[in-house]
């Protein structure tokens, strides 16, 4: 069986609060949030509400540097690498996640709520069914 780190909605609310505080410390005004469909959708909406950001863009070919990019987890770095080339000004790009995988190197653009406990698969409340179906 695959070891998991199960995350509750209460955990998510705490992480959103912590991540919002970390983002506000940057003293940046983000005009929007950009995300990828699936994993980033729920955290994007919650962060948008918390930060008062009205626009959320999904699956964009170009990412504005004044848009906060949001995903659920920084894991292998593959998502970051894929979208980084789409950013109009990489020096101003911020990549925000609820979790960052423990014991890996992070890009300087990453801001996160907390590190994972270990290398277990993180199961978010919105993907429990997907995970369950994937192991059957």
Q: Model segments located where?
A:
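PRPP-associated nucleotide enzymes
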Residues: 1-136
């Amino acid at each position: 069986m695959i070891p998991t780190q199960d995350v509750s909605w209460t955990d998510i609310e705490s992480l959103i609060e912590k991540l919002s505080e970390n983002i506000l410390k940057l003293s940046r005004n983000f005009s929007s949030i950009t995300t990828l469909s699936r994993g980033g959708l729920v955290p994007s909406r919650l962060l948008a509400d918390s930060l008062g950001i009205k626009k959320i863009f999904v699956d964009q070919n170009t990412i504005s540097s004044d848009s906060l990019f949001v995903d659920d987890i920084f894991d292998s770095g593959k998502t970051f690498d894929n979208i980084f080339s789409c950013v109009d000004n990489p020096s101003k790009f911020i990549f925000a996640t609820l979790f960052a995988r423990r014991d890996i190197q992070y890009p300087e653009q990453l801001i996160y709520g907390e590190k994972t406990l270990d290398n277990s698969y993180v199961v978010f409340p919105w993907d429990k069914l997907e995970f369950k179906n994937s192991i059957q």
